[in-house]
């Protein structure tokens, strides 16, 4: 069913922002409430006690035994009856699946197709290259490896399963330990400092906004830094994201970051045939020469935005009021509804 047909059946005065209770869900419902919209969380039974403690932010819950139940007809019907707009995030994509979201009958805020590209490491890097964004060298097979590399799995896994290697044999052993996955890439490991840039593209305001940035706090690689070299030697680093740290970039670097964001939005529309709407993230390493090298993107809200529930230094420059990424999503939805332009932001 097309979004146009679904919206004809909706009571737009009771439009409801809905998402899966994980990742950035609390920020999303908090932002929706700030913009006067109704809220709904799909929550696993074993998580209900925690999320129900925020019942002042959530108008209704749909309780499920497993995330795959999100695709069930009874859940879909309840969402449609609630006039729901789904806001996808990393857990939504990982647990439900980008393919499942592609044909989902409930309106989704933002682009559906970008979630498919995000889940495929090779397509992801192709999009970045086509956008003219500087990316690390990529190796087509373990045999080509001739220096330090990072091997990365596809999907929104929060860095789980990533590993470092220096030789073809180390890459093969690492892949074998992971069950020889098919969706992976081998990238040059760029030396520098990480920085992850949060963007929001708005069709309603016709502009790209930088809404914040962060650094990921990863286990065990960040813990290894506390050990003396003689003790850390021989311990294999891993990159499972457990939290986020705020960062403000040198203002001169923002110019290149903004150019990358603009190019990403333009290229996404050219390749996917639909406009990118709402939050996305470019994930980078900045070298000692000040070069921004982008190694990943996320085509939806990222968990790093949870740092800025009361707004970031950058979002305040646009709005002069507290504006989280979750509230920014809700404002775009509300403004689109009030101006009769919902079809421009929903897919």
Curated annotation (Swiss-Prot):
**Names of required cofactors:** Mg(2+); Mn(2+)
* Residues given in the record as ATP binding sites: 142-196, 218
Q: What is its EC number?
A: 6.3.4.23
Q: What GO biological process term is on the record, naming one?
A: 'de novo' IMP biosynthetic process
Where in this chain does the record put each ATP-grasp domain? 112-323
**Binding locations of Mg(2+):** 283, 296
Q: How is the cofactor bound?
A: Binds 1 Mg(2+) or Mn(2+) ion per subunit.
The reaction(s) annotated as catalysed by this protein in its Swiss-Prot or TrEMBL entry are: 5-amino-1-(5-phospho-beta-D-ribosyl)imidazole-4-carboxamide + formate + ATP = 5-formamido-1-(5-phospho-D-ribosyl)imidazole-4-carboxamide + ADP + phosphate
Question: Where does this protein act, in terms of pathway?
Answer: Purine metabolism; IMP biosynthesis via de novo pathway; 5-formamido-1-(5-phospho-D-ribosyl)imidazole-4-carboxamide from 5-amino-1-(5-phospho-D-ribosyl)imidazole-4-carboxamide (formate route): step 1/1
Q: Where on the tree of life does the source sit, at the highest rank? A: Archaea
Query: Which Pfam family is one of this chain's hits?
Result: DUF1297
Specify which residues bind 5-amino-1-(5-phospho-beta-D-ribosyl)imidazole-4-carboxamide according to the UniProt entry for this protein.
Answer: 23, 91, 244
Q: Which SUPFAM superfamilies match?
A: Glutathione synthetase ATP-binding domain-like, PreATP-grasp domain
**Transmembrane stretches, by residue range?**
none
Enzyme class, UniProt record, top EC level? ligase
Q: Name one GO molecular function term.
A: magnesium ion binding
Alphabetically sorted, this entry's keywords are: ATP-binding, Ligase, Magnesium, Manganese, Metal-binding, Nucleotide-binding, Purine biosynthesis
Q: Which family does it belong to?
A: Belongs to the phosphohexose mutase family.
Instruction: Kindly give the HAMAP family that the UniProt entry links to this protein.
Output: IMP_biosynth_PurP (MF_01163)
**Briefly, what is this protein's role?**
Catalyzes the ATP- and formate-dependent formylation of 5-aminoimidazole-4-carboxamide-1-beta-d-ribofuranosyl 5'-monophosphate (AICAR) to 5-formaminoimidazole-4-carboxamide-1-beta-d-ribofuranosyl 5'-monophosphate (FAICAR) in the absence of folates.
Q: What is this protein called?
A: 5-formaminoimidazole-4-carboxamide-1-(beta)-D-ribofuranosyl 5'-monophosphate synthetase
Species of the source? Ignicoccus hospitalis (strain KIN4/I / DSM 18386 / JCM 14125)
Q: What is this organism's lineage?
A: Archaea, Thermoproteota, Thermoprotei, Desulfurococcales, Desulfurococcaceae
Q: Which gene encodes it?
A: purP
């Amino acid at each position: 069913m097309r979004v146009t047909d679904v919206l004809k059946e909706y009571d737009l005065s009771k439009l409801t922002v809905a998402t899966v209770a994980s990742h950035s869900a609390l920020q999303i419902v908090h932002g929706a409430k700030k913009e006067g919209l109704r809220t709904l969380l799909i929550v696993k039974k074993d998580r209900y006690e925690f999320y129900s403690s925020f019942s002042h932010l959530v108008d209704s819950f749909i309780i499920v035994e497993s995330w795959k139940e999100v695709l069930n007809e009874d859940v879909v019907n309840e969402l449609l009856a609630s006039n729901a707009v789904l806001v996808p995030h990393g857990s939504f994509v990982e647990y439900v699946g980008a393919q499942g979201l592609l044909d989902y009958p409930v309106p989704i805020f933002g682009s559906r197709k970008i979630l498919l590209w995000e889940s495929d490491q090779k397509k992801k890097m192709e999009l970045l290259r086509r956008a003219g964004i500087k990316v690390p060298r990529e190796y087509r097979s373990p045999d080509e490896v001739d220096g330090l590399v990072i091997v990365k799995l596809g999907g929104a896994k929060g860095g789980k399963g990533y590993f470092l290697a220096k030789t073809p044999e180390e890459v093969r052993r690492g892949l074998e330990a992971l069950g020889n996955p098919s969706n992976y890439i081998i990238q040059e490991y760029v030396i520098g400092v990480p920085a992850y840039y949060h963007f929001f593209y708005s069709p309603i305001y016709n502009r790209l906004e930088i809404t914040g940035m962060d650094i990921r706090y990863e286990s065990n690689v960040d813990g290894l830094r506390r050990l003396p070299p003689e003790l850390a030697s021989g311990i294999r680093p891993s990159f499972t994201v457990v939290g986020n740290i705020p960062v403000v970039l040198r203002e001169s670097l923002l110019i290149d970051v903004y150019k990358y964001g603009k190019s990403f939005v333009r290229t996404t529309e050219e390749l996917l045939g639909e406009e990118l709407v709402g939050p996305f993230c470019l994930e980078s390493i900045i070298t000692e020469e000040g070069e921004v090298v982008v190694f990943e993107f996320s085509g939806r809200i990222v968990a790093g935005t949870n740092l800025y529930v009361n707004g970031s230094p950058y979002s305040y420059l646009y709005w002069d009021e507290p504006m989280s990424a979750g509230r920014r999503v809700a404002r775009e939805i509300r403004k689109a509804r009030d101006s009769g332009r919902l079809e421009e932001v929903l897919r």
